[in-house]
Every structure is written in structure tokens, then in C-alpha cells.
A protein has these predicted regions:
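Feature captures hydrophobic
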Residues: 1-122
Length: 122
């Protein structure tokens, strides 16, 4: 698993992903184990990420999974049930909560954003 900072650089340097998310303007919560991060997105670019320390701060929606689940999802070739966030959701490996309308309206953008933290072939 790469650092959050490295992941954000990968997201913001992916022109196709930014173009796909050009209408996305929101903050969402992404949980890795005990840690939640607020991702602020403007026109498809991640403008800021902050570790959530105040529990009342939240985003439009939340995606949360245990660290081991995300580590498996971010493998270069993820194992069965870890290859896609909906497969993970069906197996109760992640939780999706909140106002899901913008998530579903931009589904491929968010799936690609999350998958962009996958390990590269070396």
C-alpha cells in the first residue's frame, strides 16, 4: 500500500481520470482500518486530503474497509472478491454509506480513483 500522498499524486497526474471526474465537486470519507480520510475533490482533482480527527466531520458519502481488504484490493492482480469495490461490498469487506447519488452518478470515476492505488508491475 502506498502512502496517501503518493496515491493523490497518481490520481491528479492521470488526465483521463480527471477528465472522467470533471463534474465531481464534493468531499467524501475514505476509511482504512481505524483511520478515516476526507478527500476534497474539485472538478475531478483531489484538492486536499485530511485525516479525520473530529468525528462529526464527514463527507457526502463514506467508503470504509479494513486495512487488509484494501491491501488485497490494491495488489497488482487482486484475488477474487477483492478486484472490485462492488465485489467487496457483496462480501461485506467494505461499507458504503451516506448520500450515494453522486457516487453512483460518477461510479466509474470513483472505482478508478480507488483502484489507482494499485501496485505497478515492476
Amino acid at each position: 500500500m502506498q502512502s496517501i500522498e503518493t496515491w493523490i499524486v497518481k490520481i491528479n497526474s492521470n488526465k483521463r481520470l480527471i477528465e472522467k471526474g470533471r463534474w465531481v465537486n464534493l468531499t467524501f470519507t475514505f476509511g482504512i482500518g481505524q483511520n478515516d480520510y476526507l478527500f476534497e475533490i474539485i472538478e475531478g482533482k483531489v484538492i486536499s486530503t485530511t485525516k479525520r480527527t473530529i468525528l462529526t466531520r464527514s463527507g457526502t458519502f463514506k467508503i470504509h474497509g479494513e486495512k487488509i481488504a484494501w491491501e488485497k484490493h490494491w495488489l497488482n492482480i487482486p484475488p477474487r472478491d477483492y478486484h472490485d469495490i462492488f465485489a467487496m461490498l457483496a462480501k461485506k469487506l467494505i461499507i458504503l454509506d451516506g448520500n450515494l447519488t453522486p457516487f453512483m452518478q460518477n461510479l466509474q470515476y470513483f472505482k478508478d480513483l480507488i483502484a489507482s492505488n494499485r501496485q505497478s508491475i515492476k
